[in-house]
């Protein structure tokens, strides 16, 4: 996903 890690 893209939110806390900006890459997941």
UniProtKB/Swiss-Prot annotation:
GO MF annotation terms: toxin activity
Does the entry feature the keyword Transit peptide, yes or no? no
Residue ranges annotated as transmembrane are none
Cite a GO CC annotation. Answer: extracellular region
How is expression of this protein distributed across tissues? Expressed by the venom gland.
The coiled-coil segments of this chain are: none
Location in the cell reads: Secreted
Keyword Membrane listed? The answer is: no
UniProt entry keywords in alphabetical sequence: Secreted, Toxin
Which domain of life, per UniProt? Eukaryota
Q: What is this protein called?
A: Toxin To29
**Upper taxonomic lineage:** Eukaryota, Metazoa, Ecdysozoa, Arthropoda, Chelicerata
